[in-house]
């Protein structure tokens, strides 16, 4: 009496396949770690390289050479393809008009609706220091903080100069410097901020140095304004009077404390 052979995979073959898969994944992760260390990437990039090391790259499917004409409904009345018309008629990003209530809302508007540094800077002005402090009460990611520092460094002097020209040199640049100091202080109250600063990486250090160099210049200008005409200090302290504080935001003590908080040595 003959019995039919059992073609089901044995338990041993399954274990061998799983072991081979685990060995491949372990080798891929080790190679990704070595490659990340050699490239000296920051923590976020290192984590992403390790997590995706075992994944195979997605390749685009091969397009078949089809010489047949497209059907008439693929074209619009102007002769262009409908897909091209749809892509050209996409609405531009919507400018945010409301203060976000969560870090997720902030990040979505920051990335999606603020494409340029000037748009991002105006979004920071919309949120204000108090709004940013509330949004990032739990924590702020190193990537968002790095982008925020780059926007502040690139835009605050330009916005201050434009305001100076519009107001006839009424201390508007000092107001912008005060706003930057208040934003940096508000963000620094986030949870685990010291760890976030460590995760910024060396790429953010030049940005921080340029930003605080400009703030140090604002400190000198603020001191000169206090020693000179009386109307300039009043203009420089106006935003803090609204918030219930009469302390000059561009004081050397506050800027030096911020500089240490963001990991820079005292200048």
UniProtKB/Swiss-Prot annotation:
Q: InterPro entries this protein is in? A: CC103 (IPR042422), Dynein_attach_N (IPR031733), RPAP3-like_C (IPR025986)
Question: What keywords sit in the KW lines?
Answer: Cell projection, Cilium, Cilium biogenesis/degradation, Cytoplasm, Flagellum
Is Cytoplasm one of the keywords UniProt gives this record?
yes
Q: Which Pfam families match?
A: Dynein_attach_N, RPAP3_C
UniProt region (Disordered), positions on chain: 86-111, 226-250
This protein's GO CC annotations:
axonemal dynein complex; axoneme; motile cilium; outer dynein arm
Keyword Cytoplasm listed? The answer is: yes
Which compartments does it reside in?
Cytoplasm; Cell projection, Cilium, Flagellum
Q: Name one GO molecular function term.
A: protein homodimerization activity
Q: Tell me, which GO biological process terms does this entry list?
A: axonemal dynein complex assembly
PANTHER family from the UniProt entry: COILED-COIL DOMAIN-CONTAINING PROTEIN 103
Under the subunit heading, UniProt states: Homodimer.
Outline what the protein does: Dynein-attachment factor required for cilia motility.
What protein family is recorded?
Answer: Belongs to the DNAAF19/PR46b family.
Q: Please report the name of this protein according to its UniProt entry.
A: Dynein axonemal assembly factor 19 homolog
Taxonomic lineage: Eukaryota, Viridiplantae, Chlorophyta, core chlorophytes, Chlorophyceae
